[in-house]
Amino acid sequence: MSRKQQLLKRHRRLKRLGLLAGLLLLLVLGVVSWWWLPLLLLPLVWAAHEAWFADHLFYSPGEDYQYRFGEQTREAATSLSDGLLATDAQLAGDETLVLEIRVKSGWLGRFVDPRVELLDGEQVDQQTFERGADGLRFLNLTGLGGALSAGRLRLRGRYCRLLGAPRLWITPHSELRRRRIMVIAPHADDAELAAYGLYSQADEAWVVTLTAGEIEAEHYQQMGLAKAEAARLKGRLRAWDSIAVPRWAGVPESRCVQLGYFCLQLPTMQAAPDQPAASREADMADIRPFRRFNPFPLPADADGEPTWNNLLADLRALLEMAKPEILVMPHPTLDPHPDHLCAQAAVLEALKGIAWQPSTLLCYANHLHDNDRWPMGDSGDGVALPPQLSAEQAWAPCSLPLDLPTQRDKAMALGMMHDLQPPAPFKRRLRRLLQRYLAGRQPSPYGENEFFRKAVRRHELFWRREL
């Protein structure tokens, strides 16, 4: 069981205990007072829970975030006085800038998401944190270096205060878009969620998707399909998405590859490298039907077996063919999804068997262990650094600013992804309605799926390491 599954299991157990205690309290209240009072309070208590206590937050918001940025990143003297941020550092304006500062929620910040506004004249960014936040947080100032150097950048807390002496961390700019890039996507849409802005602006980009993403096809079962048939249809659609959607960004289909391995089976493959791991739901043990859109043959096409050794052979062939200078893939500790962990492990293992080696790793996190809402806040906001409560590894932050047209193009790319199109369940829509009017949370203008809010932002955030 993964750490996230353990945290979720504990969260649900505590929630059941809290629900039982609440029901007992209402029952006692009905006995000692008016019998109808619990019936009146029950829907109000449920609405309050959905509005303010339904987030999957598996840590205390009073804890400090902790980061080590490594040798590429330097600290610069900075000060915050009457909301004006100042530094003596000489900035070119294109660096990745991270401000470490203590954020303390006010009493309203326990019911409305606290946020920090970054003000440069009429230009406004805002970055949002957990309700009740009271600890060190890391603001992303990338793209605001000019305003900071000119002494125009102001910070203002909404439903929170900024305390203590800030620390400014500067990572020098590295021109990523002029180098050959390969984005490793465990599933169709991972490349777009994490790196659409990067790969759409790169001179030469490859998008390699590892799995067909065929499971959890209930939406297609509603069309009258059996479970296995629905899974096969979903896999075919997502395989098509992985080849077709990057074309919207200008990536030719000759550099888009779908490997067709089965969703959530990469850990099983890794555990027994020469043993096939069939699909959980599609009643298939041959990956070739999901690879038929590929522009050229790959080693695993010979037998179509979903094995770890075949995956490594496919990756080695692609790496030797593309010779990427930059590899973009899931972060090994921040992103807990089993397929994401195995994807980065497979790439690193494949690199050991070939002569060509990339110069730079860029890692992303589309999921977190302990906060399902990160990046917090609304579409179009900046992306503050995610919660990390222990700094075990040193990675340099690397943030790419996205202008509004690029954000809109990214939203359209996500909208083309079939897995992000089905409507949300009624309970989730009702929860969002309550949160909108009781907690001030705004829906994304681009789409109903939560990833439109999370991914269509002012920044794309990566973690960089030179090899």
Regions found by a protein language model. Give the residues of each.
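Active-site rim elements
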Residues: 228-232, 331-337, 394-403
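PAPS-dependent sulfotransferase catalytic core
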Residues: 370-405
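Lipid deacylating catalytic domains
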Residues: 332, 401-404, 459-466
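Active-site rim/loop-helix segments in enzyme catalytic domains that contact anionic ligands
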Residues: 2-321, 344-356, 363-367, 392-396, ...
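Terminal non-domain segments
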Residues: 357, 362-364, 372-376
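Proline-aspartate-enriched helix->loop->beta-strand connector
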Residues: 315-333, 340
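Short, catalytically relevant binding-site loops at active-site mouths
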Residues: 333-335, 368-371
